Amino acid sequence: MSTEVVEEFDADYTGRHFLSVEDMSSDDVMRIIERGRQFKAGDAPRVEPGHVAINMFFENSTRTMTSFQMAEHRLGMKILDFDPGHSSVTKGESLYDSVRTVDAIGAEVAVIRHSTNHYYDYLLATGMLGLSVVNGGDGSGQHPSQCMLDLMTIAEEFGHVDGLTVAISGDIVHSRVARSDAQILTRLGANVVFTGPREWMDHDVTRLGTMATLDEVIADVDVAMMLRVQHERFDAGPDFSATDYLHTFGLTDERAERMKPHAIIMHPAPVNRGCEISGHLVEAPSSRIFEQMGNGVMVRMAILEQVLHGRETK
C-alpha cells in the first residue's frame, strides 16, 4: 500500500483506548499523523470542551507528560492532578485500584505510564473500567504516542516513509521507543538497521531489520535515530564510560559529517549529551530533536480526539 501522507482525516476513525502500535493498521497510523499535521496547521478540535483527563505517570517524565498536558489543554479538557508520591500508592494501593478510583470520581481519559510491560491488559481484562486508557509508555514494551510523533517528523521531512533507511542506534533491549518505531517503520516500508552494543540487542526487535555498526551504515541512512542509554533499567557497572560509548557507538562529529546532505538526526530524549551524541549535534541544522517534541503535542491532540470520539461511538 502507499505510505504517502493521507490528505483527508476520517472523522469516523475511532478507538476507545490507545495502547500499542500492534493494535494499529498502517492506515490508522497515517490518519493520526495527518490529523496531527492538521492541528499543526491550525485546524480546530472536533470535540466539545470540558472532558476530564488525568495523567498518571508512575515513571519520571518531562516531554511525554507535559506534551499530553498541553494537548489536553488545547482540546479544552479539564485536567486532574495526580502525583504518585503523594497518593495512596505510597500506602500500597495497586495500579488497578488507583485507576478504578479516578474512574469512579469522573475521569474520562487516563494517560498512564508504568514500569510493568502491558499493564493495560490487566486493567482492561476486568471489564470494570468506564474510562479510556492511553498508554504513555509501559516498561520496555510500547511507546505508541512517541512512535506517532517520530513518524510525523519523518513524514514532514520526506513526504513518505517507504524506501527510507532508518538507523535505530543504541540501547535496543531496554527501549520501548525502538520496539514501537521498528514495528511501524518496517510495516510502512522503511529499511531499519539496528546498531549498538551487541549485548543490548533484542532479537524480538532486531528481527524486524538488519544489524550493523554505525560506521558501516552512517553514510547511507536517511534518519539516524539515537537512543538514550537507560541507566535506570540496568546497572552498566563502574567501568561504563560515556566518552568511550560515544566513540564506539554514538553519533560523533566525524560520523555526522559522513551523513547524506538531506539526512536528519532524531532522538526520543532525554539526551545524554556526550554519550549517545556529541552535545552540539543536538541543535545542529540536521537535528530534528526539538521538532519531534513540538510534533508530540500535535499527535497527542489527535490521539486524545480519537479516543474521545471512540467513547461516543462504542
From Swiss-Prot:
One of its GO terms (molecular function) is amino acid binding. SUPFAM superfamilies: Aspartate/ornithine carbamoyltransferase. The keyword Ribosomal protein does not apply. It catalyses: carbamoyl phosphate + L-aspartate = N-carbamoyl-L-aspartate + phosphate + H(+). GO terms for cellular component: cytosol. It is an enzyme of class 2 (transferase). Its EC number is 2.1.3.2. One of its GO terms (biological process) is 'de novo' pyrimidine nucleobase biosynthetic process. The keyword Transferase applies. L-aspartate binds at K91, R176, R228. Transmembrane segments: none annotated. InterPro entries: Asp/Orn_carbamoyltranf_P-bd (IPR006132), Asp/Orn_carbamoylTrfase (IPR006130), Asp/Orn_carbamoylTrfase_sf (IPR036901), Asp_carbamoyltransf (IPR002082), Asp_carbamoyltransf_Asp/Orn-bd (IPR006131). Carbamoyl phosphate binds at R63, T64, R113, H143, Q146, A269, P270. Catalyzes the condensation of carbamoyl phosphate and aspartate to form carbamoyl aspartate and inorganic phosphate, the committed step in the de novo pyrimidine nucleotide biosynthesis pathway. Heterododecamer (2C3:3R2) of six catalytic PyrB chains organized as two trimers (C3), and six regulatory PyrI chains organized as three dimers (R2). Belongs to the aspartate/ornithine carbamoyltransferase superfamily. ATCase family. This is Aspartate carbamoyltransferase catalytic subunit. It comes from Cutibacterium acnes (strain DSM 16379 / KPA171202) (Propionibacterium acnes).
